[in-house]
Amino acid sequence: MEEQYDNKDNIVLEAEVGAGDIIYLTVSGKITNERFYAFVAWTEKVKKLVREMSEKHPGNVLLLSEVSGVSHFESKPIVPLRELLNYNKQYPAKSAVVGARDLTRVLLDTVISLTSRVNIKQFKTKEEALVWLLEKPTIEAESLLAPVEAA
């Protein structure tokens, strides 16, 4: 597991490919302006994993983010978070977020809205998130996603 741990601010930033080729992300602790560059490095690692999984599984990149340990999130790291969500729009990816509380949930909702991402959902449990990530699109949803042929 690739892990960046900073004891000073008690932050943990993890990114790894796990079972089912799901990209598992963990963000925990105080995400402060002082730790901005550590957060940027982590988002770059996530982008690399998304690219790799997109090459391995075109059209089916899955991410599961555990954020229940986030106790503080300052303004400066919001920029690379927004850039990460924008970057991932170019890939057919589903992202599930688990454990967001109060202000973290509001922050995520805002960033999701600002980036116009429709394939990110927040869940209370990892089990609920995995069920959603692994569900196949319905026939109706598949037809909505199919290219329209010229008449």
Which residues are covered by each model-predicted region?
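Amphipathic, Lys/Arg-enriched alpha-helical "gate/interface" segment within cytosolic domains
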Residues: M1-A151
